[in-house]
Regions:
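Cap/lid segment of the alpha/beta-hydrolase catalytic domain
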Residues: 132-227, 268-279, 285, 491-583
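Generic beta-strand/beta-sheet core signal
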Residues: 126, 169, 239-241, 246, ...
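Primarily recognizes the serine-hydrolase "nucleophile elbow" in alpha/beta-hydrolase
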Residues: 220-292, 576-613
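Loop/turn elements at helix/coil->beta-strand transitions in domains of secreted/extracellular proteins
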Residues: 134-137, 162-165, 232-235, 256-260, ...
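Bacterial N-terminal signal peptides
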Residues: 9-21
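Positively charged n-region of N-terminal signal peptides that target proteins for export
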Residues: 1-8
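Alpha/beta-hydrolase-fold serine-hydrolase catalytic core, especially in secreted/extracellular enzymes
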Residues: 24-120, 304, 311-497, 503-510, ...
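Mobile cap/lid helix-loop segments that gate and shape the active-site cleft of serine hydrolases
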Residues: 197-198, 204-205, 259-301, 305, ...
Length: 613
């Protein structure tokens, strides 16, 4: 154990909380003078609201002139590029057309291509027949159904019957592109959203996101579409519903090849969604959106002045009020740019998804802007196909069918291995360089100052020790609850054991046997709850069981606002160390930090005067 003297330190924990979070037996070991189970989430949401308010001020100013509006949109686009990350060099798509299914007035081509080496993408191309080529075309980006493109798409059939080709793309984790599968290709997770969430955690460690990777695959799908002589490259659209609506929103602002778009059953405001239901699954978020003041309507606004349609249901779980507020911004934007007719919204007496009425409006919108045709939508035959006949792969999954296929997990491991030498080079740099980069990753602009306020909240005298309760307050941060155990045998040289554990301090203190030996040895015990643990643990029912653990919603909100939980908890540790430096019972005593059921790699930066023993 290292002993730190004169220790103004920064303890940075890099890693993840693992294991099942257990509700602490707090009871008499509560140190906060208040009780509010959702306090931590409320604290985080204040930043969400502040960021949204700042964004509102900026967009209202942009609405005052066309030049201001264009400047706002370009600013959104540049900030979006920063958070979506970089993409690989384009390589050969290695397209394979593996089959053809005949429909009524159209045919479906079954196609496989590589968006990057080893990443196979399965698609269906609904191609209208008896049409003058080249024809207009659109991408259909799939919602969250586990079967992805599945056995058929009613919207694609309707589009094809009206002279518009449709390329339906299997996203990562759906259709024939499941990643978490057994040797036979059977899914190991509960639905697409669970797989998306688990895969996104791995992507986040590499500085990207599942949403960004979906963008890349969709971009390459459009690249393929434009290689075809029977497709008109000047008449291209994109649409999607639910998770496909998410993909559409994230896609359209960065690809000028898209001339018309429609977002169904996704469009609302992020602020409103986080308030009502909390963060969604892993493909629905790109880290730091809030920090960069990017709202869901901003991704749609980047489509302007190209035609855009919003499709909503009055009884959708996607909040209609937020959708209406966002659409009002779209209307204002398009009006300022002089093209109010190029944005529209349909709200129907239904819930989630792309139902009949929405499909009719969708095809009508695309006919108008891709074909200059406002005639009534032609009905399509409701053809039915067997799922087995519609598969592009021999075994139903690319990762067990295609030679050289790489799972997303293997891709990520390969990327980590590729970066190994870069990590070694980085760690050879000076302390200040490393510290600056770590602070950036943790969402800390700088180390907090020493200013904390110590509030005593309770005191109990026991036979062998005195028990003191405190809440430690640092401006702008969550208060840190802690309990100090001063044994009767303590002296000027007694070490302080600062104990931090996943279950909270109450679990440790509720069993006398846990600390009896420390009392006998005269050790001073300081037990505390880092934010989101112990006294401020988020109630489990606010996070769906399919997500990581009960910390999911607060972890995702923290990433959204640009303040990862790990960085926030580093500030809590600093607050505790400042407490040890300032409180009359503790100043001058050596401090040892124990992490229990918290997996950390500890990096400690010390003042020049600090001494290690």
């Amino acid at each position: 154990m290292r002993k730190i003297i004169g220790f103004r330190t920064l303890c940075v924990g890099l890693g993840i909380w693992v294991g099942t979070v257990v509700v602490s037996a707090q009871g008499e070991f509560k140190a906060l003078p208040w009780s509010q189970s959702t306090a931590y989430n409320s604290y985080l949401m204040r930043d969400v609201h502040r960021q949204f308010a700042s964004r509102q001020s900026a967009i209202q100013q942009a609405f005052t002139s066309p030049a201001g509006m264009q400047e706002y949109l370009e600013g959104c686009r540049e900030r979006y590029k920063q958070i979506v990350g970089t993409f690989p060099e384009k390589e050969n798509l290695n397209v394979q057309v593996v089959g053809k299914i005949q429909g009524t007035g159209y045919h479906i081509e079954k196609i496989i291509f590589e968006s990057k080496p080893g990443r196979y993408v399965t698609v269906h191309l609904y191609m209208p027949e008896n049409m003058t080529v080249p024809v207009p075309a659109t991408l259909e980006l799939c919602g969250h159904g586990l079967n992805g493109k599945g056995s058929s798409s009613h919207a694609a059939m309707l589009m094809a019957s009206n002279g518009i080709a449709v390329l339906v793309v299997d996203p990562i984790g759906q259709g024939e592109r499941l990643q978490l599968i057994d040797r036979e290709g059977k899914p190991l997770t509960r639905g697409a959203t669970t797989e998306h969430t688990l895969l996104n955690a791995g992507f986040n460690l590499l500085g990207t996101s599942l949403a960004a990777q979906e963008y890349w695959d969709n971009h390459r799908a459009l690249d393929y579409l434009l290689t075809r002589k029977d497709i008109d490259p000047e008449r291209i659209g994109v649409y999607g519903s639910s998770g496909g609506g998410t993909q559409t929103a994230y896609y359209i602002g960065l690809d000028p090849r898209v001339k018309v778009a429609a977002i169904c059953s996704f469009f609302s405001t992020r602020e409103r969604t986080m308030e009502l239901q909390g963060p969604s699954d892993g493909c629905q978020h790109i880290p730091y959106e809030g920090r960069e003041q990017l709202e869901v309507p901003d991704f749609a606004l980047m489509m302007a002045p190209r035609p855009l349609l919003i499709l909503s249901g009055k009884y959708d779980f996607v909040d209609l009020w937020g959708a209406q507020q966002g659409f009002a911004e779209l209307q204002q934007c398009y009006k300022v740019l002089g093209v109010p007719e190029k944005v529209d919204m349909l709200t129907v007496e239904t819930g989630h998804g792309l139902g009949t009425e929405k499909r009719q409006k969708l095809v009508s919108w695309f006919k108008r802007w891709l074909k200059d045709d406002q005639s009534p939508v032609k009905k399509s035959a409701q053809d039915r196909f067997r799922l087995s006949d519609m598969l592009c792969t021999t075994k139903g999954q690319v990762n067990v069918s295609m030679p050289g296929a790489l799972s997303i997990m293997q891709e990520n491991v390969n990327q980590l291995d590729e970066w190994a030498s870069k990590r070694e080079a980085f760690l050879s740099k000076g302390k200040k360089t490393i510290q600056a980069r770590m602070l950036d990753l943790l969402g800390l602009k700088d180390l907090p100052d020493h200013k904390i306020r110590i509030e005593a909240t309770g005191h109990d005298s026991m036979r062998e020790y005195e028990q003191y309760k405190f809440q430690l307050i640092r401006e702008g941060e969550m208060p840190v609850p802690c309990i100090l155990i001063m044994p009767s045998r303590a002296n000027a040289d007694s070490p302080v054991e600062l104990r931090l554990q996943e279950e909270g301090k109450g679990t440790y203190l509720s069993e006398y046997a846990n600390f009896a030996a420390a009392l006998t040895e005269g050790k001073i015990l300081l037990l505390a709850d880092l934010r989101g643990l112990g006294e401020t643990t988020d109630p489990a029912f606010y996070t769906d069981a399919k997500y990581w653990n009960r910390e999911y919603r607060n972890a995702m909100v923290s990433m959204h606002i640009g303040r990862p939980i790990m960085g926030q908890r580093v500030v809590d540790i600093l607050t505790l160390l400042d407490f040890c430096s300032e409180h009359e019972f503790l100043k001058g005593h050596p401090v040892m930090v124990f992490m229990v059921r918290l997996q950390f790699m500890l990096l400690i930066w010390m003042k020049e005067s600090a001494v290690w023993r």
